[in-house]
């Protein structure tokens, strides 16, 4: 029991703190390698850099970070600085998708081939509220993303209005 007499079992407990080799972290995800090994991937929106490590077998296991400059990958259109990468997710083949808020687009990276295999501009068509908000240069766009079956992508728009597209 805690000082207030309430149980601590429903409280978040920090098990480990790990420094990330990025200036800031805007997105994280898990990626399964071909042999089943799990990797944690982190991105930030200050520079076009990705950081990852292979998950250790135990909570206290050693973490060896690796980093790569995404802007140097073949086919990447990301600027080296102020890349505006807001989210990262991985598909079942181990490819990594990066969501860029400004300009609104995604890049799908094949980590084995060290190249961008697809770059897609994100546009909301029409004249409705969402389309107008999405095209506003001062507005908010994609802040989170999830890959869905059938090659679909779900994008979370942060605010004004907050939506799932």
Language-model regions, residue ranges each:
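Sequence/structural signature of beta-propeller domains
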Residues: 1-165
């Amino acid at each position: 029991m805690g000082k207030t007499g309430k149980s601590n079992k429903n409280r978040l407990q920090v098990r480990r703190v790990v420094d990330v080799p990025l200036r800031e972290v805007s997105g994280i995800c898990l990626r399964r390698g071909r042999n089943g090994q799990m990797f944690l991937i982190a991105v930030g929106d200050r520079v076009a850099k990705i950081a990852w490590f292979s998950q250790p077998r135990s909570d206290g296991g050693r973490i060896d970070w690796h980093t790569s400059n995404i802007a140097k990958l073949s086919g990447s259109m990301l600027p080296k600085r102020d890349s505006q990468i807001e989210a990262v997710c991985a598909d079942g083949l181990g490819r990594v998708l990066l969501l860029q808020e400004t300009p609104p687009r995604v890049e799908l990276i094949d980590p084995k081939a060290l190249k961008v295999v697809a770059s897609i501009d994100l546009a909301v068509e029409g004249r409705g509220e969402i389309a107008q908000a999405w095209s506003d240069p001062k507005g908010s766009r994609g802040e989170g993303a999830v890959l869905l079956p059938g090659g679909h992508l779900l994008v979370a728009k942060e605010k004004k209005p907050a939506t799932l597209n």
